[in-house]
């Protein structure tokens, strides 16, 4: 007789939601002992990872720092290293999470894709943190023109409200890698990441935000090429 044991943990194949993995009892390899090292190494952290690897790690970091998950800390992190030795920063930020994997990877229209994605994420941010933010912030934000202006407005309003932002950008290089695969786009790519291109302006605005309410950044992707351009020009 074939019997499936109900005691064995399941492998979280294809799963990236840390809360689901932990609360539903999936197998999880504890790597949270590295969190204190990351916190002490740099407030603005850039992480290059192999493709399709460590996706859930970014997710658990988002969950760890989110002020909204404070009451769930023991359920999510109990038994893990960080649950036994929590850091001072846990559950103390408004988390702004951007994932560039869905942005259209064509240089002639990537700005519209970036604006649309950020608009959705900024609106969601205003909704879930409404109790921490000034009334009417979402309506004022929506009146701004594009991701650069909206980000500028958002981090200034958070500063006025006395709130700190932890900015996560996942797959920051996704649409840029698609652009670089097209030889005809290389010249325009250089234009966008040098001088006053829109992508450069966006990362410049993040840098400006680090003097305001953006207290920490965690940027991850699979290629250093885009970050090499913006870092080498003093953007981050």
Each model region followed by its residue ranges:
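Phosphate-binding site recognition
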Residues: 1-236
């Amino acid at each position: 007789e074939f019997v499936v044991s109900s005691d064995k943990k399941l492998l979280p194949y294809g799963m990236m939601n840390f809360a689901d993995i932990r609360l539903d009892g999936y197998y999880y390899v504890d790597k949270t002992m590295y969190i204190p090292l990351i916190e002490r190494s740099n407030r603005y952290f850039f992480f290059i990872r192999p493709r399709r690897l460590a996706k859930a790690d970014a997710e658990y970091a988002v969950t760890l720092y989110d002020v909204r998950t404070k009451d769930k800390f023991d359920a999510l992190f109990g038994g893990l290293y960080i649950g036994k030795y929590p850091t001072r920063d846990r559950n103390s930020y408004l988390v702004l999470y951007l994932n560039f994997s869905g942005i259209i990877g064509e240089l002639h229209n990537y700005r519209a894709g970036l604006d649309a994605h950020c608009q959705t994420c900024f609106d969601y941010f205003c909704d879930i943190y409404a109790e921490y933010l000034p009334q009417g912030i979402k309506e004022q934000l929506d009146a701004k023109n594009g991701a650069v202006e909206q980000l500028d407005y958002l981090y200034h309003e958070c500063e006025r409200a006395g709130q700190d932002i932890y900015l996560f950008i996942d797959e920051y290089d996704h649409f840029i890698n698609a652009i670089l695969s097209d030889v005809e786009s290389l010249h325009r790519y250089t234009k966008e990441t040098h001088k006053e291109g829109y992508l450069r302006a966006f990362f410049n605005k993040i840098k400006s935000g680090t003097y305001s309410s953006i207290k920490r950044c965690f940027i991850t992707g699979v290629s250093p090429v885009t970050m090499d351009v913006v870092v080498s020009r003093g953007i981050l």
